[in-house]
């Protein structure tokens, strides 16, 4: 497949991450264009990635095959309505804005269009992201491949069968980094109370999190089995696990993810008006 021409509407952090991932994969600078209202941001992105960055959204999409909508959700309706006259029916629209349903994007863009809705997460900034993608009925197989390649430039990209699953993706991976940050904070605090220096407790916690994630990724067994293998009867790990479970750890996680998923659905209803 030939490299598509990609236009980014909005050149903030997530767009910059995607552009950087594409450039690292060898996508020519000439195939990428971006737009942004801020002169300072335009200069920064143009200088960092050697791509054409313009002020006009219409100019950015003029010859694009793929148009990536990377503006804040609150601004999406106005941006789409202003951009609609400049778009061609065959251009693939990829939205990385949280909470905006495909139907709303199509309505704001004026007609049924091929739309892929994505839910990336912040580790994409380090090209370690996890994204869920949903394609509407107008998206072709070739366009699905283009969208998948785009998000794969910053991590893993997994396709969803139902747009409603975006809420679950938001709960698991979209908001997920914050859950791990919270656990890291709690472990560091507890380690300090046990007598470690703040720096030592933090470094041990972060390296343990990284090592555990790498073990889980490289293993062919479920995390539950990995946990069992490192939990000796009557040992220190078992004592900690029993304390977690006695205090309802699994139920607490389920409740938290349900709350995030429900809030995602509520925001989609509000932002999609």
Swiss-Prot record:
It holds the Pfam family F420_oxidored. GO terms for molecular function: pyrroline-5-carboxylate reductase activity. One of its GO terms (biological process) is proline biosynthetic process. It catalyses: L-proline + NADP(+) = (S)-1-pyrroline-5-carboxylate + NADPH + 2 H(+); L-proline + NAD(+) = (S)-1-pyrroline-5-carboxylate + NADH + 2 H(+). It comes from the Bacteria. One of its GO terms (cellular component) is cytoplasm. Keywords: Amino-acid biosynthesis, Cytoplasm, NADP, Oxidoreductase, Proline biosynthesis. Belongs to the pyrroline-5-carboxylate reductase family. NCBIfam families: proC (TIGR00112). This is Pyrroline-5-carboxylate reductase. It comes from Pseudomonas aeruginosa (strain ATCC 15692 / DSM 22644 / CIP 104116 / JCM 14847 / LMG 12228 / 1C / PRS 101 / PAO1).
């Amino acid at each position: 497949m030939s490299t598509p021409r990609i236009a980014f509407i909005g050149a903030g952090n997530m767009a910059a991450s995607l552009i950087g991932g594409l450039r690292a994969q060898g996508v020519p600078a000439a195939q990428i264009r971006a737009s942004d209202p801020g002169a300072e941001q335009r200069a920064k992105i143009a200088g960092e990635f050697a791509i054409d960055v313009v002020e006009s959204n219409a100019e950015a999409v003029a010859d694009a095959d793929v148009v990536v909508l990377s503006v804040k959700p609150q601004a999406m309706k106005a941006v789409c309505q202003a951009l609609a006259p400049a778009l061609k029916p065959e251009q693939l629209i990829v939205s990385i804005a949280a909470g905006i349903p495909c139907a709303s994007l199509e309505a704001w863009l004026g007609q049924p269009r091929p739309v892929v809705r994505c839910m990336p997460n912040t580790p994409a900034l380090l090209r370690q992201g996890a994204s869920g993608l949903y394609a509407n009925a107008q998206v072709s197989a070739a366009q699905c491949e283009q969208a998948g390649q785009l998000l794969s430039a910053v991590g893993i990209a997994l396709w969803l069968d139902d747009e409603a699953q975006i809420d679950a993706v938001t709960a698991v991976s979209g908001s997920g980094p914050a859950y791990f940050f919270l656990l890291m904070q709690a472990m560091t605090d507890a380690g300090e109370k046990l007598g470690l220096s703040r720096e030592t407790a933090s470094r041990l916690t972060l390296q343990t999190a990284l090592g555990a994630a790498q073990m889980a990724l490289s293993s062919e067994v479920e995390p539950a089995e990995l946990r069992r293998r490192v939990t000796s009867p009557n040992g220190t790990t078992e004592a900690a696990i029993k304390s977690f479970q006695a205090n309802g750890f699994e139920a607490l996680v389920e409740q938290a993810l349900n709350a995030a998923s429900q809030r995602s659905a509520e925001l989609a209803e509000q932002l999609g008006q």
